[in-house]
């Protein structure tokens, strides 16, 4: 069980670092896994020998942990699990090339080391070698009665990056537990494609979803987002309006439609739609930020300030509302407050850009 907990921690760490999933989803996926074959003996021996290595790794002292492993390798001719532990430590250090080399060696020593297979797939992916990641990640999927969500997502991304879009669709269909040829499958894949900046293929898949089921919730919204992304604003508006006919209680559609109207400088229409979006969902910052921009364009700067202050109260680390608030303060002559907000916006943007 310690091995399973270790793999959960590593996958959670990877997901946090890549900002793809939450660590809790990784833990849930591990609950479905078949128990990985242990590569270490019970009690003393490897567990005891690797204890200090794991302690150093938990503290982020990866070079020291690797030095400990190298000492162990020099002192003992055979230490079961040593290659595996090298791979884990290199993985946590983000040295994915060396992690792959270590996991390959671990699998030569124990071909049924499931942890090594999964972490090798992740290492290939993080090293930018999507084609090589596919084989190990496909194998991971055979261990689960239902999809391992983390591995299925990454596998789908790898298929996309190698331009194998039908296989990506099947991976996402399994992930969401829908038929591979269904409208929902095309919708989910189109969403993932847009997120990864594959806009032309995303449009193709979204249109296919509409063809299969014109009344599928959110499909017209996604197509509208794709058109907005491509600056095809009239077409985006048409799709958002179709979505509202099917899904009039969806706050995000009003927000997206308001965004489209604001790009055409139709600020009155945009303001009305933003009010409806906020009435339906007062917890999202996007409509408040856009409301601030729209009100400022209308010359209602005092009201714009209130909307932007509300957005900042909800998300104080977002640089955009601080920047817009600084501009609004400058317009109404509150120079000192304007400079403070603009400086803070710049600092937050630098911090945001510095994140991996």
Regions found by a protein language model. Give the residues of each.
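Alpha-helical segment of the N-proximal tetratricopeptide repeat
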Residues: 45-71, 75, 88, 92, ...
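Helix-start (N-cap) detector for alpha-helical repeat units in TPR-like alpha-solenoids
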Residues: 46, 80-81, 114-115, 147-150, ...
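Structural signature of tandem alpha-helical TPR/SEL1-like repeats
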Residues: 60-67, 93-105, 127-139, 162-174, ...
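Structural marker of alpha-solenoid helical repeat scaffolds
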Residues: 75, 109, 143-144, 177-178, ...
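Canonical tetratricopeptide repeat
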Residues: 85, 119, 153-154, 188, ...
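TPR/TPR-like (Sel1-like) alpha-helical repeat modules
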Residues: 313-315, 319-353
């Amino acid at each position: 069980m310690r091995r399973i907990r270790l793999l959960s921690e590593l996958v959670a760490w990877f997901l946090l670092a890549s900002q793809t999933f939450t660590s809790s989803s990784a833990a849930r996926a591990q609950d479905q896994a078949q128990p990985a074959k242990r590569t270490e003996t019970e009690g003393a021996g490897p567990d005891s020998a690797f204890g200090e290595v794991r302690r150093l790794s938990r503290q982020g002292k990866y070079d020291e942990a690797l030095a400990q492993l190298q000492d162990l390798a020099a002192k003992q001719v055979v230490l079961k699990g040593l290659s595996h532990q090298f791979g884990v430590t290199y993985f946590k250090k983000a040295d994915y090339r060396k992690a792959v080399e270590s996991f390959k060696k671990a699998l030569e020593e124990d071909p049924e080391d499931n942890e090594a297979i999964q972490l090798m797939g992740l290492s290939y992916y993080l090293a930018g070698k999507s084609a090589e990641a596919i084989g190990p990640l496909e194998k991971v999927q055979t261990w689960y009665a239902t999809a391992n969500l983390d591995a299925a997502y990454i596998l789908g991304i790898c298929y996309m990056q190698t331009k194998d879009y039908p296989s990506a669709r099947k991976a996402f269909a399994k992930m969401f537990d829908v038929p591979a040829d269904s409208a929902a499958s095309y919708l989910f894949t189109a969403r993932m494609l847009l997120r990864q900046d594959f806009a032309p293929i995303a449009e193709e898949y979204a249109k296919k979803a509409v063809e299969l089921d014109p009344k599928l919730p959110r499909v017209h919204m996604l197509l509208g987002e794709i058109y907005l992304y491509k600056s095809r604003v009239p077409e985006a508006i048409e799709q958002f309006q179709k979505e509202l006919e099917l899904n009039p209680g969806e706050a995000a559609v009003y927000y997206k439609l308001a965004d489209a109207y604001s790009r055409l400088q139709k600020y009155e229409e945009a303001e009305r739609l933003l009010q409806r979006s906020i009435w339906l969902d007062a917890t999202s910052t996007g409509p408040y930020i856009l409301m601030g921009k729209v009100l400022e364009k209308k010359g209602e700067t005092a009201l714009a300030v209130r909307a932007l202050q509300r957005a900042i109260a909800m998300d104080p680390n977002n640089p955009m509302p601080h920047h817009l608030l600084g501009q609004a303060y400058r317009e109404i002559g509150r120079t000192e407050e304007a400079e403070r907000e603009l400086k803070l916006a710049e600092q937050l943007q630098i911090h945001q850009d510095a994140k991996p």
